[in-house]
Structures are given as structure tokens and as C-alpha cells.
Amino acid sequence: MKTKTLKLKFYTDPGHGWLAVKRVLVDQYMVSEPVTGYSYMNGKTVYLEEDYDAPRFLEAVKGAGYIVEIEHRNSPHKDSPIRRYEHFN
């Protein structure tokens, strides 16, 4: 069986962090428990909040056989623009 790799970006600002995931993957792997309103969306990307939604997504994709590689992007001195995106619904 060929190993599947999923490359994701994790964005942080001084107060919080979000894992950027394509909406199609969220819909596929987070079926049993819906995403909370603490996550955001912009276009076809969902920004899963770090405390609850992101860990559940990572657990689901790892359980499906993916190896996950995460690139960290940090905004240490100002709020991330993600905070202005639409809340997930």
C-alpha cells in the first residue's frame, strides 16, 4: 500500500492558531462530529481552530492512513487576517 502524504499549513497569531484544510477534506473526514463555530472559512479553505477542530481532523486523516506534514506560519505581533473570515457554518 502506498503511503499518502497530506501537506497542510498551520497559522498562528499572538492569541490563537488555525490549521488550513480544503473544505472537501473537512467534509470527507469530519462527518461524525461537525466543525465548531470557532473555525473560519474563506473560499474553499477551512481554518480549523487549534484546540478542538484541528486535532479531531488530524486524528481522522491519520486514522485513514495519511502522513501529515505541517508548515507553520506565524504572525507574532498582530492578529491574523483569518480572524476576519466568515465563521464556519
Question: Language-model features: where?
Answer:
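Short, compact, well-ordered microdomains
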Residues: 49-89
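Short secondary-structure junctions
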Residues: 31-39, 65-72
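N-terminal acidic leader/helix
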Residues: 4-36
